[in-house]
A protein has these predicted regions:
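N-terminal secretory-pathway/extracellular module detecting exported/lumenal segments
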Residues: 23-88, 92-188
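Bacterial N-terminal signal peptides
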Residues: 9-17
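Bacterial N-terminal signal peptides that target proteins for export
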Residues: 1-9
């Protein structure tokens, strides 16, 4: 009787693996311009060959303490490893730290000089990000091995340092959602 139960469990596992659809991502799919947009010059991890965003995934919301948040799914092509990294990223924008608001603080003498403003902006860009979910695929669309994916997930970031690619990407997303660049936002 025991061998029959083992066979039944194996058969059920095989049947379920055929029924449950698996999501994958390939380079060919990223070429679908109606769903994905390539953002030139935004290789997030230094050796990336381009960042694609899923246009349907972009969602804006109000965050804590008056911040704005934008969630987006990004695909970063990593040609050195023939892989595609899928990152679900949550960007949080503190509009009190936009250039427009910092200049307003300078004019009201809350900041001493343009140099102080510039150093403040470099220290705290006003934009933070967190990688909410991470997956890795071979360029042909097959899922990457889970051990390598777990290692790469720990290294996966979406940096938003002022003046660098991640900050420019965040600004572009903000403009797409709100019609104005993040640094042009001025509070009342």
């Amino acid at each position: 009787m025991r061998p029959m139960i083992k066979v039944l469990y194996i058969a059920m596992a095989l049947a379920l693996s055929c029924v449950v659809p698996a999501h994958s991502m390939s380079m060919q799919e990223l070429q679908n311009t109606s769903r994905f947009e390539m953002l030139h010059g935004f290789g997030e991890s230094g050796n990336g060959d381009g960042t694609y965003i899923d246009k349907d995934s972009i969602k804006a919301s109000n965050g804590p303490n008056g911040t704005k948040q934008i969630a987006v799914t990004q695909y970063v092509l990593m040609p050195a490893g023939d892989t595609i990294q899928e990152k679900n990223v949550l960007y949080t924008f503190d509009t009190k730290q936009s250039f427009g608001n910092l200049i307003k603080r300078l004019e009201s003498h809350q900041l001493g000089s343009y140099k102080e403003l510039w150093l403040f902006k470099q220290k705290y860009s006003g934009v933070t990000s967190s990688v909410v979910d991470f997956k890795e695929y071979h360029i042909d669309g097959n899922r990457y091995d889970t051990q390598s994916e777990a290692r790469d997930r720990r290294m996966a970031t979406a940096p938003v340092d002022f003046g660098f690619a991640g900050y420019l990407l965040a600004n572009r997303l903000y403009e797409r959602m709100y019609g104005v660049q993040f640094d042009d936002v001025v509070g009342k």
